[in-house]
A protein has these predicted regions:
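Acidic, surface-exposed loops and disordered segments
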Residues: 2-356
Length: 356
């Protein structure tokens, strides 16, 4: 038996949506993609501990919500994880570094969910080898389940259903306290190096760098189109394909119905939709109040998995603390147009030979 993404075995899911009511809702108030949200309510309802763990793991963050995982359950007490090579991001993520980080997030959430059930997972990464330049059909991980009373991390586990990546400007009236920063650093235990800043000058530099990186991704036609092709606009599209970049809820439904928001409009570089979208992402980047980043000694597949495991732990602790978190990793992307900012961010945040 194998399961793939959030749309199989009743593990249906996509982006998290809250539909707004109020005057004029009518048709639009019915536009919540209910079946695409079932993954959250179905989590933890299985007799097989592997299925239970997987029902939480599919809620893990992953780039562009591609959900590139395939889980094979044919061996007893074992999950074999593969990557779906049809769900990669060849333009923004040409070496699939971000995809592998997302698989690391998946493995960490699976581990937390298994621990909550009284199981320890033994994870054998890339048992048949790996290629740092491309992904293939070899196993990403073989995961064995063993009973254990020592594996649970209940505080982190409790945050899994509520964890989100913030997609709106940060509250610039709220400072991020040093105690919160210390808590984020303390949860990085899987092997990455972690650093943070809430110091004004450093924050200003990172705001500027992330805004420039978003602008490059937006204004490079092939990388921008890669995102636009993954837009899921309105309830019917989210229900049909509960992956990608979610634009559902009354506002987006209304804009779509009136023709003000569509893939065609988004691709018109001289149009309102394109220009306002660029302004929105750039302005959001310039509201960050503190930054946390993870550093690896190499850029190997192993280190990418570890970074993903540590990243989702940071995201879960931030959720517990009531902090909004958004990955601003565009400057870390490895396509030619981003090379100058890639060099800048590594000079700013990493030592020689390390990878942010």
């Amino acid at each position: 038996m194998s399961i793939s993404r959030r749309k199989t075995l009743a593990l249906l899911g996509g982006g998290f949506v809250v539909a707004a009511g109020g005057a004029g809702a009518g048709f639009l108030s019915t536009r919540t993609p209910t079946s695409a949200l079932e993954a959250w309510s179905a989590a933890g309802r299985y007799d097989d501990p592997r299925m239970n763990a997987l029902s939480y793991a599919i809620l893990a963050p992953n780039p562009h919500n591609r959900q590139p995982w395939i889980a094979d359950l044919s061996r007893p007490d074992t999950v074999t994880l593969y990557v779906d090579t049809n769900r990669l991001l060849p333009h923004t993520d040409p070496f699939s570094r971000q995809i592998v980080i997302g698989l690391g997030c998946f493995l960490e959430v699976l581990s937390l969910a298994a621990g909550q059930q009284g199981f320890r997972v033994d994870i054998d990464l890339f048992p048949d080898g790996s290629d740092d330049s491309a992904l293939d059909d070899k196993p990403v991980a073989v995961i064995g389940f063993e009973p254990s009373e020592q594996a649970a991390e209940p505080k982190l586990f409790a945050q899994i259903p509520d964890r989100r990546s913030l997609k709106e400007p940060f509250d610039t009236s709220r400072q991020v306290s040093q105690s919160a920063i210390d808590a984020l650093l303390a949860t990085v235990t899987r092997g990455s190096h972690a650093a943070t800043t809430n110091e004004a000058d450093s924050v200003a530099k990172l705001r500027d760098l992330t805004a420039k990186a978003l602008e490059i991704e937006f204004e490079t036609p092939r990388t921008y189109k890669e995102s636009v092709d993954l837009f899921r606009i309105g309830k019917s599209e989210v229900e049909a394909n509960p992956d990608g970049i979610d634009f559902s809820g009354p506002m987006w439904e209304a804009l779509h119905l009136t023709g003000l928001f569509s893939r065609k409009a988004a691709m018109d570089r001289d149009g309102f939709t394109y220009r306002s979208g660029l302004d929105m992402v750039r302005d959001t980047a310039r509201t960050g109040m503190a930054y946390v980043w993870l550093i690896s000694d190499t850029n190997s597949r192993y280190d990418q998995i570890v970074a993903g495991r540590d990243w989702v732990r940071v995201n879960l602790v931030a959720t517990e603390l009531g902090l909004g978190v958004q990955p601003m990793s565009q400057a870390l992307q490895e396509y030619p147009e981003m090379s100058d900012l890639y060099a800048d961010v590594h000079q700013m945040l990493a030592s020689q030979g390390q990878t942010v």
